[in-house]
A protein has these predicted regions:
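Amphipathic regulatory helices of Ca2+-sensor modules
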Residues: 55-65
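Glycine-aliphatic tripeptides that mark coil-to-beta-strand junctions in extracellular
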Residues: 51-55, 95, 233
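EF-hand Ca2+-binding helix-loop-helix modules
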Residues: 30-44, 58-60
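Acidic carboxylate motifs that coordinate Ca2+ or other divalent cations, activating on Asp/Glu
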Residues: 46-50, 230
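Serine-hydrolase catalytic machinery in alpha/beta-hydrolase-like enzymes
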Residues: 74-176, 186-189, 193, 236, ...
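Primarily recognizes the serine-hydrolase "nucleophile elbow" in alpha/beta-hydrolase
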Residues: 165-167, 172-220, 231
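Short beta-strand/loop motif that positions the catalytic acidic residue
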Residues: 224-226, 230
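Bacterial N-terminal signal peptides
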Residues: 12-21
Length: 251
């Protein structure tokens, strides 16, 4: 799949200003949260308290996650997806909208630690949303990362964008999606599925399908950011869940 580059959009201050104004360490996973997640899992599922998870305990974890997976509609009440506006919001003024998507096992709060739109929104005057994926994942591609494949996140995120447009004065020519790892995969999925809404995407360490079923109906700008030494979503491409994902360059 090829996305046409429109320099006037990629060069927009809303994107360049946000990316260049903040220091951050790019990684495909939130390393800071890994020990915390493991400790919580051990406390809950390590029944014999031997510090290890045997197969029965691992199966209990898998069942725990799968119980809450039904459909995007059934689980919508579990999502946190508040739309945030600047303190001095003026309904007569058009605002850019940024949708930022967390990585696998993350959530909206963790994504805002990675990309602090909550602090930047006042400075750059935009509206944003950092929603939660069901069970901390997005059903983006066959490789990453909803293991059940039953949540229609593409439909859900489209409805979220339309909700923002209905409730606030959103500039339809400045609708941006950014995401980390699994969220980056989802940003590519949204650019493909909803090119009528999405102006540009900025994926961090996330790609799309190895083979796209079609091109998007409208051109979407892409600013792809990826570490060449990323060991999770590899620069040169690889496989997850017996499915392939493309290299950053081929993507």
């Amino acid at each position: 799949m090829k996305f046409k580059l429109k320099n006037r959009i990629i060069g927009a201050a809303i994107l360049v200003g946000i990316i260049t104004s903040m220091p951050f360490y790019l990684t495909a996973e939130d390393e800071e949260e890994k020990p915390i997640r493991r400790e919580r899992l051990m406390q809950r599922f390590d029944k014999n308290k031997d510090g290890k998870l045997d197969e029965s305990e691992r199966e209990a974890i898998r069942k725990s996650f799968s119980r809450s997976r039904r459909s995007g509609e059934d689980n919508s009440a579990k999502r946190v997806d508040k739309i945030h506006v600047p303190d001095d919001y003026d309904p007569k003024k058009k605002y850019p909208f940024i949708l930022t998507l967390h990585g696998y096992t993350g959530n909206g709060r963790a994504q805002l630690r990675f990309l602090p739109l909550d602090r930047l929104a006042e400075k750059y005057d935009f509206i944003y949303c950092a929603p939660d994926g069901i069970d901390r994942s997005w059903n983006a591609t066959d490789a990453c990362c909803d293991r059940q494949g039953k949540v229609d996140d593409s439909k859900y995120l489209r409805s979220l964008i339309l909700k923002a447009m209905k409730e606030y004065n959103i500039d339809r020519k400045r609708v941006y999606i950014t995401g980390l790892s699994n969220g980056g995969f989802m940003s590519y999925r949204m650019a493909h599925d909803h090119s009528d809404l999405v102006t540009a995407i900025v994926p961090f360490a996330g790609v799309g399908f190895d083979k796209w079923p079609s091109n998007p109906k409208n051109p979407v700008s892409v600013l792809h950011i990826h570490g060449t030494k990323d060991r999770t979503i590899k620069w040169g491409g690889g496989g997850l869940r017996s499915a392939r994902y493309p290299s950053a360059e081929d993507n």
